[in-house]
């Protein structure tokens, strides 16, 4: 677990909000909902490996939002990245390494595996909040569901749970 105070984690994500380029995720027929992916840096000049739109880095940033207590922002970035790579890209249903929004490379490396691991982590640890603590032989639940969700469920080999929200009561 991150030992930094929540305020510091929040501040780090605010840096992303204010200083890292946000690129709108748009498509014909996609309802405008403020979806956006991000570049890895704001450094110039733009060059390969300096300012990419890389799925693994975007997913790590989404996880950072969840870890900072900013579930809505984490979910929005997660969903934006899923839309970008799995629906709008040239290889539907796949996470490649680089988004087609990347100015230098465009969509490439469709069989690159590192985004899959971190996408799984942001889904399980960020959205569903399943945080294993092996040293203490426990699993901590700290879900990051969006405010407008009224139900969700997850099942892994180690844990399964259901979530429901009715008015002001969340039940797990």
Residue ranges of each PLM-predicted region?
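Short amphipathic alpha-helical patches
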Residues: 101-105, 146-151
């Amino acid at each position: 677990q991150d030992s930094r105070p929540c305020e510091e984690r929040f501040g780090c994500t605010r840096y992303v909000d204010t200083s890292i380029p946000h690129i709108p995720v748009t498509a014909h027929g996609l309802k405008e909902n403020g979806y956006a992916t991000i570049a890895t840096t704001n450094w110039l000049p733009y060059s390969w490996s300096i300012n990419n739109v890389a799925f693994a880095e975007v997913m790590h940033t989404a996880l950072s939002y969840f870890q900072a207590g900013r579930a809505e922002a984490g979910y929005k970035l997660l969903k934006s990245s899923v839309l970008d790579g799995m629906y709008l890209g040239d290889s539907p249903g796949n996470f490649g390494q680089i988004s087609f929004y990347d100015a230098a490379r465009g969509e490439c490396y469709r069989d690159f595996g590192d985004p899959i691991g971190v996408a799984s982590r942001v889904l399980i640890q960020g959205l569903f909040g399943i945080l294993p603590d092996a040293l203490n032989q426990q699993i901590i639940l700290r879900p990051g569901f969006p405010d407008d969700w009224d139900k969700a469920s997850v099942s892994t080999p180690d844990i399964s749970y259901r979530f429901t929200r009715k008015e002001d009561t969340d039940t797990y």
